[in-house]
Regions:
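Divalent metal-dependent catalytic cores for phosphoryl transfer on phosphate-bearing substrates
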Residues: 1-152
Length: 158
């Protein structure tokens, strides 16, 4: 059994894994994981992935996946910890933090083509792949297909 700190660390690490699942084009079981419960589609995907692939307790899944819908929680600190970590990791300034959940433009229809960015992408673009010494340097080549689908298959095999 994990401690609460360990559970919150897991929730914080996995809270946006749904963005990966969306881009990998996995199917969402809408009847069980509704966008309306979580406020954003990627959060519903996160809940499904954490339930299906990580077999996490539903309370832990909620700490993580409800990070955009705090008004529907009981106000416990655990929800706020993950939500605050999400905002801090995104580098939000205070005024952006206050308007974050109100901005519905965040998930437009073209989300699948929007590359997930990391700190290394600021200057150059890196291949979307597993971390490996053979692909740690940036590439000039552009992908001709959805690299997230390939990466998802590798993820499942691990």
């Amino acid at each position: 059994m994990n401690s609460l700190n360990e559970d919150l660390a897991i929730a914080g690490l996995l809270h946006d894994i749904g963005k990966f699942g969306q881009r990998a084009e996995i199917s969402l079981r809408v009847s069980q994981f509704s966008k309306y419960r979580y406020n954003y589609l990627h959060a519903a995907f996160s809940a499904q992935i954490m339930t299906d692939y990580f077999e996490l307790d539903s309370t832990l899944v909620d700490y993580s996946a409800m990070h955009h819908n705090l008004k529907e929680t009981d106000g416990r600190d655990e929800y706020w910890i993950v939500a605050s970590a999400d905002r801090l990791a995104s580098g939000f300034e205070r005024e952006k933090f206050e308007n974050y959940n109100a901005n519905a433009d965040f998930e437009s229809e073209n989300f699948k083509t929007q590359r997930l960015r990391n700190i290394f992408d600021e200057k150059e673009e890196y291949k979307i792949d597993v971390l490996d010494v053979r692909n740690i340097f940036s590439k000039d080549e552009k992908s001709t297909h959805n690299e997230y689908v390939d990466l998802w298959k590798k993820f499942l095999n691990d």
